Amino acid sequence: MRKLLVKLMIALMAFALIPVQVAQACSAFIVGKELTTDGSMLFGRTEDYPYAPDGGRHNKTYEVVPAKDYKDGDMLEDESNGFAYPHLSHEMKYTATYDAAHGDGSNGNFGAHGFNEAGVSMTSTVSATPHDKILEADPLVKNGLAEAAMVDLVLPRAKTAREGIELVAKVLDEKGSAEGNIIVVADKDELWYMEILSGHQYVAIKFPQDRYAIFANTYYLGHVDFKDKENVIASKDVEAVAKKADHYKTDKDGNFHIADSYGPDEYTERNRSRTYAGITLMDPKADIKYDDKHFDLLHKPTDPSKKYSLEDVFAEQRNRFEHLKQYTPDDLVEPGKEVDTNKYKYALGNENVINAHVYQIKKDLPTPFGGVVWLGLAQSRNTPYVPFYGIVNDTYAPFKVRSAKYDPTSWYWAVWHIDQMVMKYPDLFGNSIQEKWKELEKGWIKEQAALDQKYSGLTDDQAKATADEVTSDSLKRAETIFKQIKQVESEMEDKIRTEKGLEADFVYDGYNKANLVAAAQAKKDASKETEKKEETASSQSSSKASDSNSSLSAVLGVLALAGFGLAGFYFKKSKKNENEE
């Protein structure tokens, strides 16, 4: 029984260390259409998975969820926390980029981002942590709305971006939130940015088209006009809860400041480094300092003529402090070495990225197309961004491989493996792989612009009729690009074999520094545990030997006494016999 209890305790301790995935190291951007080279709205996110021993090694699948009819009582259920919400009688088709394990009961769906057939797009979520005082006043709800279910809640239902935000607000009012989160929802007319601030508080704004934003895992909204119902959607008690929590903060003009009231007192280094890097990359002359108390959400470039392209935002997601020479990505620190935190920082293009994506929303594309997603699975630093329309009704087979370990037939695992080889052998590959993708992307951008022109004059009905054609073209393009990816992977393996020998590590298990540190620590802990067990066993053995010696001594003592007793008995008897004789 005791052994069983020990085993159960160990199992429970191990289980407690396995996190339900919340993408707590994500970062995102938005660029309004007045600031882009082609007049499109741009937004995107890098989904990070920083959980050792599988940091940066977490398969994502790009899929189409068909339209579906439901009967009364059918529920959307989040297996990550028990959240449930009624399905509509009919729900729309949409795309999503799921965790490969979705639906198996282990961790939730985490659809991440997608388009629906009404032309609505979203990315969800950038996690954020509310202030402790706020959580005392308005706690998170264990089975409330969480990241894992967000895409599956919004995209099947929302016919406009505003509807998507209003739906989330309604659910938060009714069910509460399980997490602090930030989401972005767009259609071809407008884009909304929403901060989920606590168990039941939230603020969303219609994003101004003459601004850009860079945001990581914390809150950024300053003062907003709650009376402006056209451009702001907010919970009714957002100010009252801050006051109740005794954490009501104002800006220099005395106006309620949302982020200062609901967010932590200080940014974490990971949030500070990525936000600062993103803003200064977009605008090298931005009037900010690394150690500013907070960074504003909305920015205008210092140069009024500055316009941003797709390549600019790809570069933002790949950035590894190339423009900030005083900093070095912390995933380059050798395991076991001390980290100089003044030099080594967490980069936007870091080792934990599992899914990068950029959404390009063009006003002149028909609504059913939604726009274009530029999909960059695995680490953004060494993955290609590949374009797909939102209207597709199927995705290429390698996007749907659901293996948990390296699989050569998987798009995710192929590009992941390429990145791992680059990082393991920088002397062999340097920046050559990223440069190769950049060159190919130039061609894809031109091809995509021509396709956009081809479809831009269609009515919505005409656009819907092209879905099969567009899907067929997308599948062919994906097949061609995947062959290029596999060719690059094969050439890299050949180079490693030639330069490093047949016994070289081909990195099929990955090369994530955080994982290596965790593995080294686990090995160290296991060694200590083995030593402890050996010491305990030795101690127990000594104790048993001592006990045995004591027992033997006792037995010998008894025998000795018995011997003396018998001797005395015979001596006395002999004496008696002598006297009798």
Language model regions located:
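Histidine-centered catalytic/metal-binding microenvironments
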Residues: 438-531
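C-terminal membrane-anchoring or membrane-association module
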Residues: 564-581
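C-terminal low-complexity, Ser/Thr- and acidic/Pro-rich disordered "stalk" regions positioned immediately N-terminal
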Residues: 524-549, 580-581
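Substrate-recognition/cap regions that form aromatic- and gly/pro-loop-enriched pockets
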Residues: 330-459
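A contiguous strand-loop segment
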Residues: 26-146, 167-308
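Short, hydrophobic alpha-helical membrane anchors of single-pass surface/secreted proteins
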Residues: 548-564, 570
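Hydrophobic core
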Residues: 13-21
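Bacterial N-terminal signal peptides that target proteins for export
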Residues: 1-9
